[in-house]
Amino acid sequence: MAMTEYNPPKDPWIDVIYEDEHIIAANKPSGLLSVPGRPVEHYDSMWARLVDYCPDVKVVHRLDMSTSGLILFAKGKHMESALKKQFQYRLTHKIYYARVWGVMEQNEGEVNLPLCCDWPNRPKQKVCFEEGRDSLTRYQVVKREEKTTVVRLIPITGRSHQLRVHMQSLGHPIVGDDLYAPPEAVEFADRLQLHAAELCFYHPRSHWLRTLFVPCDFYPEAEEQILQHFDPERKLPDYKKLSQD
């Protein structure tokens, strides 16, 4: 399933929310790629914009093009390696907000369904108990609306399209999701209503715990609260004692 048209937002060109000599974090708008695509016309991306601003910037993780919110980059290869290792060992913690289709009855719960690529329908992913990788998402209802529900999503694993497929599996696809939602849910909003609001990680130089937060445009009531859901150590733990993702 190829991208038919790519017209990313240009204002603001870059929205840096935190920067020091080792890392840089930005608020990526919906509709902008995290990294360049293969066609030259898909070069414009969060990384490409930042590399003009900071030539040493390195990719640490990605957000789907349609997802907005907090994305973290490293400055230099050493910082890149240190941060990527935290994602690999599940030392980072994230909170997303989403508006989903339908009114959810259950206040909270979790989805534990293995995911893999749906190869004939790429880039779609699918639930697959034979070949899928373990995938776990926790969810909490924060606001019920007439036709939709705003939920807080806490991914424990970080699979491609995990939140989108897991919410679809509950019968509540994310509003504006042109891959997994029915037409009426897609047309209900002008963008995918999924936002990466909060990230908790260990600063790669100091090794002290750090949290960053980006307000959610479609749910401005969102507040920082990641440490209410996790109890990480204040200092970076020993990798040798941890299992990999």
UniProtKB/Swiss-Prot annotation:
GO molecular function: 23S rRNA pseudouridine(746) synthase activity; pseudouridine synthase activity; RNA binding; tRNA pseudouridine(32) synthase activity
Species this chain originates from: Vibrio cholerae serotype O1 (strain ATCC 39315 / El Tor Inaba N16961)
Name of encoding gene: rluA
Keyword terms, alphabetized: Isomerase, rRNA processing, tRNA processing
CDD domains referenced in this protein's UniProt entry, alphabetically: PseudoU_synth_RluA_like
Family: Belongs to the pseudouridine synthase RluA family.
PROSITE patterns: PSI_RLU
Function statement: Dual specificity enzyme that catalyzes the synthesis of pseudouridine from uracil-746 in 23S ribosomal RNA and from uracil-32 in the anticodon stem and loop of transfer RNAs.
Name of the featured protein: Dual-specificity RNA pseudouridine synthase RluA
Span of the signal peptide: none
Residue spans crossing the bilayer: none
SUPFAM superfamilies, per the entry: Pseudouridine synthase
Active site per the UniProt annotation: 64
GO BP, sorted A to Z: enzyme-directed rRNA pseudouridine synthesis; tRNA processing
EC assignment: 5.4.99.28, 5.4.99.29
Catalytic activity: uridine(32) in tRNA = pseudouridine(32) in tRNA; uridine(746) in 23S rRNA = pseudouridine(746) in 23S rRNA
